[in-house]
Each structure stands twice: as structure tokens, then as C-alpha cells.
Regions:
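Carbohydrate-interacting regions of secretory-pathway proteins
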Residues: 22-240
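Positively charged n-region of N-terminal signal peptides that target proteins for export
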Residues: 1-6
């Protein structure tokens, strides 16, 4: 029997290279952003003007801090998303397997965060007068607000990428995120460099993060894979 994670990578091999799968052809992927409006998404705790569409791009003002979520839950899937920060030190991310709501007293939801930080963040947020840890801008994976997971390249509870592949302000970055049976593997600009496993949540919502500065998104697509053995405790409650 082919396990779902093996299936996911077998699929990549059959379809071709990362660029071929995610950049040049749909290959069964479904668009999550139509380039015209916010169909398929719901604001959780942001303002009416936080998320807008301009010239076919999804534009996030960064204010206030919060998220918008997908209307649908996802379990096993491959997510393709392209992003660029418009301000030095910008902060954002995408949550997978999220509960899709924000508890009282918090600004962000429970979920697995796939970090998106602009490269100057470590210079703006110095530690003891020196640039902060490079892991922050590497495309880290970590459980947020109660989600537990095991990092494959640990930096505390976070998993940092093994190579620094993110591009800076005004440049487009490409994330391909494979999420199967509690394991998340991240490709940054065409190369798999990070992973985390044993997630306590394995089915939930996608959330896009607004956190202080303008960020643009485009080409948000998803390929759903066969379901796994996911328990009720590992599944987010449906939001009606």
C-alpha cells in the first residue's frame, strides 16, 4: 500500500519538476484566489479594507493584525502560494490545519504556521545589538497557539530551513507546501528545505496572516490528496 506522503512525492515525480508542477500547469490544482474578489475566503478578525484585490493581486494592508480563512477545510494537500513583502522587515505567514477562529485575548489562531518574513526583519528586530537569528527569515515551520509538532531541523519548537532561499522586499517568493498525515514539507523557490511532523492537528482551515505591513499574494492553488486516518481530535470544528 502506498502511504499518502509517499503518494504525494510519487505524484511530484510523475508530473515532473517543482516548476512544472506548480508554475507551468494546473495538473489538477484548484485556484483559491480568482484575481477579482475574495470569493472562498472569510475575514476572521481583520477590517473590511485589510484585504483588497488590485491588478489581479491579493493585497493585504497588514492592519490590523489578524487573519482571514478559507471557507473550506483541508486535510491532505499540496498548497502553492506566491508572495512578496512591500516593506523592509515585513511579517506574515500562512496557517495550515488551523482552527480558523481566534480565541478571546489573542490575535492569531491555532494552527501550523508557515512563516513569511522579509529579510530585513532580523536587522530591524536586533538582539543584544546584533542581527537576530537567521532562522526567523528562513521560512520557519511551527505550531502556533497550542498546536504541537516535532521539528525536523529544530530551533526550539520551530523548524528552520536548511538554506536561506527567501528573496527580499518587492521580489516574489514561491512556497510549495506539502501537508500529509501530520507532516508538512516546504519548498522555497523550487527546493525543499524544511519539514515538521507529528502535528496535533491534521485537518482544518487555511489562514492568511495580516501582521503590520503590506504584503501581496498571487497564484494561490491547492491539490487535494486522498484522506488519511485522522481522528476527531485532530480535526478542526466546522465553522458555520
Amino acid at each position: 500500500m502506498i502511504r499518502p506522503l509517499t503518494f504525494a512525492f510519487t505524484l511530484l515525480l510523475l508530473l515532473g519538476s517543482i516548476d512544472q508542477v506548480f508554475g507551468q500547469s494546473e495538473n489538477g490544482f484548484v485556484s483559491l484566489f480568482n484575481g477579482k474578489d475574495l470569493t472562498g475566503w472569510a475575514s476572521v478578525n481583520t477590517a473590511p479594507d485589510t484585504w483588497t484585490v488590485k491588478d489581479g493581486l491579493l493585497v493585504c494592508s497588514g492592519k490590523p493584525i489578524g487573519v482571514m480563512r478559507s471557507e473550506k477545510q483541508y486535510e491532505n494537500f499540496i498548497l502553492h502560494i506566491e508572495w512578496r513583502h512591500m516593506k523592509a522587515g515585513g511579517n506574515s505567514g500562512v496557517f495550515v490545519w488551523s482552527e480558523g477562529f481566534v480565541p478571546e485575548g489573542r490575535r492569531l489562531p491555532k494552527g501550523m504556521e508557515v512563516q513569511m518574513l522579509e529579510l530585513d526583519w532580523i536587522n530591524i528586530h536586533k538582539r543584544n545589538g546584533k542581527p537576530n537569528h537567521i532562522g526567523y527569515i528562513s521560512g520557519e515551520l511551527f505550531g502556533a497557539n497550542g498546536l504541537e509538532a516535532t521539528p525536523d531541523n529544530p530551533r526550539g519548537k520551530r523548524s528552520m530551513s536548511k538554506e536561506l532561499r527567501c528573496k527580499g522586499k518587492g521580489e516574489w517568493n514561491v512556497y510549495d507546501v506539502v501537508c500529509v498525515d501530520g507532516t508538512v514539507k516546504l519548498s522555497i523557490n523550487g527546493k525543499f528545505v524544511n519539514s515538521i511532523r507529528n502535528s496535533s492537528m491534521r485537518k482544518g482551515y487555511l489562514c492568511l496572516e495580516s501582521e503590520g505591513s503590506e504584503i501581496h499574494f498571487r497564484n494561490i492553488r491547492i491539490l487535494e490528496l486522498p484522506p488519511g486516518i485522522t481522528t476527531a481530535e485532530q480535526t478542526a470544528k466546522v465553522i458555520k
